[in-house]
Structure formats: C-alpha cells, structure tokens
C-alpha cells in the first residue's frame, strides 16, 4: 500500500470528522447551549 495514499486518506478522514466537531465546539463555547 502506498504510504502517501494512506496519509491522504487519513488526513481527509480527520478533516471530515474533526471539522464538524470543531464547529460544534466553538458554537458551544460561545454560550449558545
């Protein structure tokens, strides 16, 4: 398996998962519960 491909897929998965979580976290921190 190509290491670069694994890194790209890992980064894409991380962004896909972390993006909404970061937005949600910032939304909560502003007191909009």
Curated annotation (Swiss-Prot):
Q: Identify the keywords attached in UniProt to this record, alphabetized.
A: Chloroplast, Membrane, Photosynthesis, Photosystem II, Plastid, Thylakoid, Transmembrane, Transmembrane helix
The UniProt transmembrane annotation reads 8-28
- Topological type in the membrane: Single-pass membrane protein
Tell where it localizes: Plastid, Chloroplast thylakoid membrane
Q: Which family does it belong to?
A: Belongs to the Psb30/Ycf12 family.
Output the Pfam families linked to this UniProt entry: PSII_Ycf12
Protein name (Swiss-Prot/TrEMBL): Photosystem II reaction center protein Psb30
Role played: A core subunit of photosystem II (PSII), probably helps stabilize the reaction center.
Q: Subunit info? A: PSII is composed of 1 copy each of membrane proteins PsbA, PsbB, PsbC, PsbD, PsbE, PsbF, PsbH, PsbI, PsbJ, PsbK, PsbL, PsbM, PsbT, PsbY, PsbZ, Psb30/Ycf12, peripheral proteins of the oxygen-evolving complex and a large number of cofactors. It forms dimeric complexes.
InterPro entries attached to this UniProt entry = PSII_Ycf12_core-subunit
Q: Which GO terms describe its biological process?
A: photosynthesis
The record's principal subcellular location, in a coarse class, is plastid
Any one annotated GO CC term = photosystem II
Tell me where the signal peptide lies. Answer: none
């Amino acid at each position: 398996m190509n290491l670069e491909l694994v890194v790209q897929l890992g980064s894409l998965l991380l962004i896909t998962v972390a993006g909404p979580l970061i937005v949600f976290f910032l939304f909560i921190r502003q007191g909009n519960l």
